A protein has these predicted regions:
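A short, well-structured edge-of-sheet supersecondary motif
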Residues: 2-41, 170, 249, 273-277, ...
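Non-transmembrane alpha-helical segments in soluble domains
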Residues: 3, 7, 55, 70, ...
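Active-site SXXK
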Residues: 17, 41-66, 142-150, 198, ...
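Short, charged, amphipathic alpha-helices and their helix-cap/turn boundaries
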Residues: 21-29, 71, 105-131, 155-177
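Active-site helix/loop module of the DD-peptidase/beta-lactamase fold
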Residues: 41, 57-100, 126, 147-188, ...
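Active-site-proximal alpha-helical segments within enzyme catalytic domains
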Residues: 92-95, 141-148, 187-211, 244, ...
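Active-site Gly/Thr loop motif
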Residues: 172-189, 222-285
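Structured C-terminal helix/loop/strand segments within mature extracytoplasmic catalytic/sensor domains
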Residues: 263-317
Length: 317
């Protein structure tokens, strides 16, 4: 029944769709040449992965959510007198740091990761934004958070941080942070992964295998309840969503009248759509790589099939 409906849906590109319910049973649908084992560019689906990796370092004692960039990065150029001097790791992971201006180096593979982070700081140094007051969806925040993690862990680059996560968890075995390059990976959108790998990650997160209870409660806080939502791609759906640490608190409404952490997701600009529905207790991903700016198309496909998926959740056997 789900197969039939998915086959009838109009899509601009082939996709794979996988969901896992509480008993571990999975339903998978693969359209055309797409497979759950197809490697796709992540776009913003990497945001949740990056945030969880960093939150594990907090849990392991290497970092604190209250840490400021200048506590970890010797070359951090923001003046102590600047309003931006109060930004901390929690602000960075929730995109409320005030770093709204995104320099070109974030997308330049030949640039040094650390020098680009300093370029990010300098590009925003005079903006007078108070950290925590404004939500602005951009790649800047996670680059700074990532460098804090690299320094706190005492390793040369994000690749060592990611490899340690892989070794500790067994997840994302063949995935990489390699866009625009391995030397200057964009933590907010620079992975390659397969749908199967991402679904395994969501499953482990849901089961409490990646974060302890205290870390999970930190992860699930609505970090933008009082922030002004200055730039949000969710507006393309005509909806108001809030933000946590590297993911969205969804709300299918023109105002945020939903309970936070009911349904969380980290969709990407190519239309891939990973989610954890906490009210119905299942995880899933619509894996695809359409044109840039097709975020809404992946979400729309998932919404079309959701009633059938929710019926499947209730089925025995």
């Amino acid at each position: 029944d789900m197969n039939t409906q998915l086959a009838q849906l109009v899509s601009d590109t082939d996709f794979s769709f996988g969901v896992e319910r509480d008993d571990g049973r999975r339903y998978v649908y693969q359209r055309g040449s797409s497979r759950m084992q197809t490697s796709y560019e992540s776009a913003s689906t990497s945001k949740l992965v990056s945030a969880v990796i960093i939150l594990r370092l907090v849990e392991q004692g290497y970092l604190k959510l209250e840490d400021k960039p200048q506590d970890r990065i010797a070359t951090w150029p923001i003046a102590a007198s600047s309003p931006l001097a109060t930004m901390n790791l929690a602000n960075l992971l929730s995109f409320t740091s005030g770093l709204t201006e995104e320099p070109l180096c974030v997308n330049a593979g030949f640039i040094n990761f650390e020098s680009c982070v300093n370029t990010i700081a300098n590009a925003n140094a005079s903006n007078q934004i108070t950290p925590g007051s404004e939500f602005y969806y951009a790649s800047t925040h996670l680059q700074v958070a990532g460098l804090m993690a690299i320094k706190a862990r005492g390793v040369p680059s994000w690749q060592e941080v990611f490899n340690e996560f892989k070794q500790q968890t067994g997840l994302f075995k063949n995935a990489s942070y390699d866009l625009p390059s391995l030397n200057n990976p964009r933590l907010a959108g620079g992975m390659h992964w397969t749908g199967e790998e991402y679904l395994d990650f969501l499953s482990a997160l849901k089961k409490g295998r990646l974060l302890n209870a205290a870390s999970m409660s930190q992860l699930l806080v609505d970090r933008t309840a009082t922030a002004k939502l200055v730039y949000s791609p969710a507006a393309a759906l005509g909806e108001v969503w809030h933000y946590g640490l590297g993911y969205w608190h969804e709300c299918q409404s023109t105002s945020f009248n939903c309970a936070p952490a009911t349904r969380i997701s980290s969709p990407g600009a190519y239309g891939a759509y990973p989610f954890w529905d906490r009210s119905k207790s299942y995880v899933g991903i619509l894996a695809r790589q359409g044109e840039l700016g097709t975020f809404t198309k992946g979400a729309t496909l998932e919404r079309a099939i959701r009633p059938k998926v929710e019926a499947w959740l209730a089925c025995a056997g």
